[in-house]
């Protein structure tokens, strides 16, 4: 019988150490509690797994597999301790690359030995499993299902102990209490029936409910639940915002302009009602309409005008030129700021109050925008677009602002208003011109849903990507080309309609680039990396510094000697313990290039223009680090930007997404600014690298050094950028945990703690606060 990794002959101590090293670290206090609880009587259970026909082995020693069907499973050999049934505690590292995280045990047992049972096993974002479960003895069969979908996954040995009733009670009670505390103020439905009273009476039922709550997060977050818990502004907050605005010397007048053409009476009336019910009272609505407007709609509008003098109607006979019509309205308004709204869309009651509050905090604002969602004909809200704070590189790849978007009226009039010739891209063109004439701090983002985009066709219900159907692609391309006319950048259509690719110029002759590759033995991996650069890169002026950190294998040493026949390649020695930061700093000091590229030795080139693309960005004066799009060998995303806060410090967004999939509102296929990009493939000007103090070789020898470096670049005033157009493979093991030995785990915990202490809680301008810090897929914040 061929057995999985868990059957390898390890001692108890070795197995425990191996598994625990891969688990997400506990807090010091929880670690102390864990030490106390483990003093209670317990016995380790030998877990031997045999993969079934629906599981294909990739690397058995590393615990890597591929699920061929939606029901991948392993048969569990029935150890005598399992056969008895009772309470057990499972610890394991389980990484699934499909987004599905629904693991479970299932089998048969009980008095008749034939009663089927199924036990859900949740995990956290990092794939750490720490779960108490009960087996109804005697157990006659048992299987382990790591997920409920086809795709790649990896797992450690399953570390299982048969535990006492006391340990079971303490562990279950601890999680139930923590969950209840975290859910204070949540609706009853959001709790899945979990209450303090219920937990006191039926602890096991409450514990299973906490497992279901965790699994529910994996299945996708319910936007209706999110709305109920996070959408409304508390009365006290509303009162404070209102009082603050009223205390100011002047309250900004907000003008809403609208071109009305053949509206549906019901939705048109709802739109008017949503504006008239605004908590903020200093607004005006200026509309233009033509003969297509029905008598019913005219009656609705007249009634609204009689009741509200803030509504102004301008009759027109031609709405065929949108820009001309908008300019006619622009001449009529009195507001300090204005927005273009559509005839069927809605504004939540707090929308203009939030805008006024934002403007009060930054009186010099030129552009202000909020988040938005979609609404069907029945008023159902879905497909929220939670946007980043001002993200100039993303905006020049995609008009992500959409609605609600406001401009400073005087600034727009100085620019000449809306330009003709940019049909369906009038707002994009206007914002690009504002962007060119104002400072970064003058473009504000309010991270709340302030606009409901009506979707009467139901076209957007299936996918968040389709929620914003890009329009005016050619006009947008024209506007963007005009924006970059003086810089010399060229603009071409992007991967999907409405997306754009900006190619920033590289001077001639091209500057020298120094590619730095730390390595130790593993010559096959290094050779593939180097040869892919030699033969798969169209950028001519590069040198390579291979930094040998103590290779001893004869074949590696021979290859390192031979590869230097290529005059572009040097091998330099850095002996001593592994210190990623020190190794790279040492190499940068010896680099001759204007631009340096930090590169892992397990990278392989996909796109020939990867280096040209990265250098074009790196040479921009305002840019610090440039990150590439990295794929696993199975073409799933390994790196497409890093968001702060995910998993405690930072996490790779869109990890395990299909390599060509657009991601959350195109963010996996569009150039954009991220606070952090990975140093597995990172380009930066050498002078900038040295300016911010290099990588931290004292506090961050192994992990988080790229996060720290990128944050130092931000602090120095640079922007970091991710480009999907520099595409490479990263042959990082799919099963790679943070650390796989006690020594590495200790280093990780020290460096994790340093980042938390030194940088603290940093909000990420590239990642909306309404999005999850548990998951990397842009799912919604839950608690």
Language model regions located:
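C-terminal, non-catalytic tails of nucleotide-sugar-dependent glycosyltransferases
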Residues: 2, 184, 188-249, 468-510, ...
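Short, acidic, metal-binding catalytic loop of nucleotide-sugar glycosyltransferases
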Residues: 272-282, 361, 531-541
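Cell-envelope/extracellular polymer assembly enzymes that use nucleotide-activated donors
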Residues: 252-257, 284, 429, 511-516, ...
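A short, conserved alpha-helix in the catalytic core of glycosyltransferases
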Residues: 411, 421-449, 480, 610-614, ...
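A recurrent flexible, glycine/aromatic-enriched loop bordering the glycosyltransferase active site
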Residues: 323, 381-410, 581-583, 589, ...
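Short aromatic/hydrophobic "clamp" motif used to bind/position activated sugar donors
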Residues: 338, 596
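Conserved donor NDP-sugar-binding/catalytic core segment of glycosyltransferases
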Residues: 346, 350-382, 440, 456, ...
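Glycine-rich, basic loop-to-helix element that forms the pyrophosphate-binding segment
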Residues: 316-333, 574-591
């Amino acid at each position: 019988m061929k057995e999985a990794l868990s059957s390898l002959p390890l001692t108890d101590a070795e197995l425990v150490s191996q598994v625990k090293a891969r688990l997400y670290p506990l807090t010091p206090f929880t670690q102390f509690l864990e030490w106390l609880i483990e003093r209670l009587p317990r016995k380790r259970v030998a877990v031997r797994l045999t993969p079934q026909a629906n599981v294909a082995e990739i690397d058995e020693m590393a615990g890597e597999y591929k699920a061929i069907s939606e029901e991948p499973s392993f048969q569990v050999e029935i150890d005598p301790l399992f056969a008895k049934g009772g309470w057990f505690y499972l610890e394991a590292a389980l990484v699934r690359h499909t987004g599905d995280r629904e693991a479970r045990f299932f089998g048969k047992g009980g008095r008749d030995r034939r009663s089927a049972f199924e036990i859900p096993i949740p995990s956290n974002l990092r794939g750490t499993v720490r779960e108490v479960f009960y087996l109804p003895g005697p157990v006659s069969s048992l299987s382990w299902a790591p997920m409920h979908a086809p795709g790649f996954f990896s797992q450690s040995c399953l570390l299982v102990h048969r535990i006492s009733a006391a340990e079971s009670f303490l562990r279950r009670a601890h999680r139930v209490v923590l969950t209840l505390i975290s859910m204070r103020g949540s609706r009853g439905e959001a709790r899945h029936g979990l209450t303090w009273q219920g937990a006191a009476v039926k602890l096991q039922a409450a514990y299973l409910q906490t497992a279901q709550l965790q699994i529910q997060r994996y299945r996708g977050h319910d936007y209706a639940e999110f709305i109920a818990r996070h959408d409304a502004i508390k009365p006290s907050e509303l009162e404070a915002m209102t009082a603050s605005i009223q205390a100011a010397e002047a309250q900004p007048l907000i003008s809403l302009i609208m071109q009305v053409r053949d509206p549906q009476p019901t939705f048109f009336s709802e739109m008017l009602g949503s504006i008239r019910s605004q908590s903020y009272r200093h607004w005006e609505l200026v509309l233009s309409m033509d003969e297509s407007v029905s008598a019913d709609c005219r009656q609705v509008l007249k009634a609204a005008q009689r009741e509200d003098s803030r509504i102004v109607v301008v009759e027109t006979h031609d709405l065929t030129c949108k820009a001309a019509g908008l300019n006619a309205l622009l001449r009529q308004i009195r507001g300090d700021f204005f927005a273009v709204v559509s005839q069927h869309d809605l504004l939540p009651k707090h929308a203009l109050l939030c805008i006024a509050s934002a403007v009060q905090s930054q009186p010099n604002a030129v552009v202000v925008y909020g988040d938005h969602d979609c609404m069907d004909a029945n008023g159902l809200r879905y497909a929220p677009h939670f946007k980043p704070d001002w993200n100039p590189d993303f905006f020049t790849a995609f008009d992500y602002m959409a609605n609600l978007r406001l401009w400073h009226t005087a600034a727009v009039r100085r620019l000449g208003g809306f330009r003709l010739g940019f049909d369906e891209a009038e707002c994009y063109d206007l914002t690009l011109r504002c962007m060119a004439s104002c400072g970064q701090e003058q473009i504000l983002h309010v991270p709340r849903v302030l606009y409901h985009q009506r979707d009467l066709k139901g076209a957007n219900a299936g996918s968040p990507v389709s929620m914003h159907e890009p329009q005016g692609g050619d006009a947008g391309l024209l506007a963007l080309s005009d924006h970059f006319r003086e810089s010399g950048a060229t603009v071409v259509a992007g991967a999907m309609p409405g997306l754009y690719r900006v190619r920033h110029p590289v001077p001639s002759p091209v500057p020298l680039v120094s590619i730095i590759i730390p390595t130790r033995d593993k010559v096959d991996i290094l050779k593939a990396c180097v040869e892919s650069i030699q033969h798969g890169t169209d950028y001519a002026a590069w040198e390579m510094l291979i930094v040998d950190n103590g290779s001893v294998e004869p074949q590696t040493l021979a290859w390192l000697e031979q590869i230097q026949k290529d005059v572009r390649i040097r091998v330099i020695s850095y002996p001593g313990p592994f210190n990623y930061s020190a190794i790279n700093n040492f190499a940068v000091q010896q680099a001759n290039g204007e631009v340096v590229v930090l590169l892992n030795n397990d990278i392989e080139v996909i796109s020939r223009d990867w280096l040209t693309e990265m250098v074009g960005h790196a040479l921009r004066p305002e840019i610090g680090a440039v990150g590439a799009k990295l794929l696993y060998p199975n073409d799933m995303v390994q790196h497409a930007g890093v968001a702060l806060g995910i998993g405690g410090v930072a996490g790779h967004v869109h990890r395990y997404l299909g390599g060509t999939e657009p991601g959350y509102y195109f963010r996996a296929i569009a150039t954009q600014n991220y606070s952090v990009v990975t140093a597995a493939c990172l380009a930066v000007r050498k002078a900038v690298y040295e300016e911010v103090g290099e990588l931290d070789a004292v506090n961050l020898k192994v992990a988080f050094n790229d996060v720290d470096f990128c944050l130092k670049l931000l602090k120095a005033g640079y922007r970091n950028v991710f480009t999907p157009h520099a595409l490479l493979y990263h042959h990082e093991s799919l099963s790679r945990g943070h650390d796989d030995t006690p020594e590495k785990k200790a280093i990780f915990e020290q460096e994790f703690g340093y980042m938390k202490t030194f940088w603290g809680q940093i909000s990420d301008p590239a990642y909306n606060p309404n999005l999850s810090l548990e998951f990397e897929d842009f799912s919604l914040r839950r608690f």
